[in-house]
Amino acid sequence: MSGHSKWATTKHKKAANDAKRGKEFAKLIKNIEVAARTGGGDPSANPTLDDMIKKAKKASVPNDNIERARKRGSGEEAGGADWMNIMYEGYGPNGVAMLIECLTDNRNRAATEVRTAMTKNGGNLGESGSVSYMFTRTGVVTVQKGDLSEDDVLMAVLEAGAEEVNDNGDLFEVTCAPTDIQAVRDALVEAGIEVEDSESDFRASVQVPLDADGARKIFKLVDALEDSDDVQNVYTNIDLSDEVLTELEND
């Protein structure tokens, strides 16, 4: 499997179609509110908030919605919810390990919706720690290629704690420890390189190879999970060959 696509299927993301756009907007707004509450409402002093706002704008979330979420999170405006981060663990079809990251104001609702989606699509929830040992939290910072070479990016981040620079097609992806994300961002900015995105991700240490039919079952389960407003991200340890990816693209 080629390096640039290896992780593209690790965290399966929804297609931005009209049917799911409303749910995606709600999740982006929620992230802005939480980021503002955690690190303050000034995007220039809160890189996480700045990233969340950029993601929302890229997804065409109205500016008014973005601003209200920022104010709710920072306390400038009343009405913010009491959000909780919860991580569920389990297995999908073919023994695929899954981490389901939720951001919710109702623990019981989140648990019920995750369990229902898993059960109806060939998965099952496990105990805490049942699959998380297979995953490592990783910092990921991405930049647009433009005229940059891989060496340009590597030289900029070498002293900032970067572990790898991967070629992901139109983007370069810099991986690092989650605690080094800000240092890597700062190093890129100092080198005149614009940061596209930065986040903490989960990378699996052991992958499960799947054929196209197996991948379709996992994607169906992931879509069912992400239909819940409480589910923010789903991470799996699937490994898809270039041949399987090509077959899936032709679906």
UniProtKB/Swiss-Prot annotation:
Question: Residue ranges of region Disordered?
Answer: 1-22
Protein's UniProt keywords contain Cell membrane: no
Q: Where in the cell is it found?
A: Cytoplasm
A single BP term in Gene Ontology: regulation of DNA-templated transcription
Task: Recite the UniProt keywords alphabetically.
Answer: Cytoplasm, DNA-binding, Transcription, Transcription regulation
Family, as annotated: Belongs to the TACO1 family.
State the protein's name: Probable transcriptional regulatory protein Cgl1663/cg1872
